[in-house]
Amino acid sequence: MKELLYLAAFLAVTLGIAHSVLGERYILVRLFRRDDLPKLFGGTEFTTRTLRFAWHITTVAWFGFGALLLHAGRGDLTPSGTLRIIGFTFILSGLLPLVITRGKHLSWLVLFAIGGIALWGAA
């Protein structure tokens, strides 16, 4: 079973990388060329930045799942360790809207709060 969990972890990370790279190259770029994107806050920049972080946040989540699967395969997945992985996954998820939308999409506040609470629970 250990090897299958390692394989699942590898597949989760690989899928995340493929999702971000291929999605950026073949979906997002083409989508952003459209003339009919919603104009929020005076233009389409907020819309494109929000769509970009929303796309890539899936990859961060899959990396977090990959870490959980890896630790499950190693047999050292504890409640505290699980909370640490969840906490760091949410902190990394919060960095996406903070950086990509320059803080305009306020989800980063909630994502950081969730991550902080999870890390606090792990301590």
Spans of features found by a protein language model:
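Helical transmembrane-bundle signal
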Residues: 12-19, 62-69, 90-97, 115-121
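Alpha-helical transmembrane segments and their cytosolic membrane-interface
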Residues: 41-85
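Polytopic alpha-helical membrane-helix bundles and their juxtamembrane interface segments
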Residues: 3, 17, 29-33, 72, ...
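Helix-coil boundary and interhelical linker segments in multi-pass alpha-helical membrane proteins
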Residues: 1-9, 70-81, 121-123
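Hydrophobic core segments of alpha-helical transmembrane domains in multi-pass membrane proteins
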Residues: 9, 86, 108-115
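N-terminal signal-anchor transmembrane alpha helix
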Residues: 3-25
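Membrane-helix boundary connector in multi-pass membrane proteins
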Residues: 76-77, 84, 91-108, 118-123
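Cytosolic, membrane-interface loops and tails of multi-pass inner-membrane proteins
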Residues: 25-50
